[in-house]
Amino acid sequence: MGQAAVSAEDGFGVVYEIGGKDLYLLDGKGLVRQMTMEGEIFSVEMGQSGRFAVVLKKNGYKTAVSVYNGKGEPLYDFHSAQKYLMTAAVSENGKYMAAAAMSQDGGSFVSSLQIYKLTSDALRADAALTGGVYEMGTVNGAFCAVTDKALCFVKNDGTVSTYDYRGGSLSRCGLGGGKFAAVLLENYSSGGLTHLATVNTAGEEIASLSVENEVLDLSAAGRYLAVLYSNKLVIYDRNLQECSVLEDVSSARRVLMRSDGSAVLAGTNAASLYLP
């Protein structure tokens, strides 16, 4: 059995196996649909209103992207014969799909974000990215590609704004915030610091702070950012002002922020809902 993975956003979620063909679409009431893909699943990114993008390995192509709605009905299919597509996302308005592509240029690998309108196979924009892409999502109407060197915010016309890590190493990120992204960087600015920051789509820091305690997980949703430290859970706003603190979190290993200000804490054997 391969590695199980989950992508969740806006009250919907997808559970799947990397390298497998089956996925399970969920909403707040439970299972919506069990789906079998035509190829091996590389990645799935859930977006707004239940729309999600699936990157597949298909015979005859390097990779393919399929887009579905919240009922599991197909909206769009794209097949790439020239470039490998690593991950993809659907725009917040449901009109565009962006796929992170990798190709070779002079012996080295380069990454780009290819944007398509869901009514056409014609390439709308091809934006060069800094670094290799780890994750994709949307923030405040823009696509966001999380790379090993920067956060790259890309508009539908291909315009790119970048937040550089300044030599820091990406530890964790959160893209669920409505108007911000969150990053945790280690060895920031060669000072050995752990740096927590919220960032807008212009690539500018909204707020930041130095972190001394170990961070187990972080998650953003709506106006809030949840950071699970080894000794406490802190819920911040986009300005990194503390909204609430929960001290007893010794059994928790993961956190899922919710847009209403509550958070789900998950451990090895149980999960609980924190209501500030």
Where are the regions a protein language model picked out?
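Intrinsically disordered, low-complexity segments enriched in Gly and acidic/Ser/Thr residues
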Residues: 159-248
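A short beta-strand motif characteristic of beta-propeller blades
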Residues: 1-2, 29-36, 73-79, 120-128, ...
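Repeated scaffold domains used in trafficking and secretory/extracellular systems
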Residues: 2-11, 39-50, 82-92, 128-142, ...
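Structural motif
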Residues: 21-25, 60-66, 105-115, 149-155, ...
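Non-cytosolic head/periplasmic domains of membrane-anchored proteins
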Residues: 1-100
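Residue position within the beta-strands of beta-propeller blades
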Residues: 15, 54-55, 98-100, 145, ...
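Solenoidal tandem-repeat scaffolds enriched in leucines and small polar residues
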Residues: 61-152
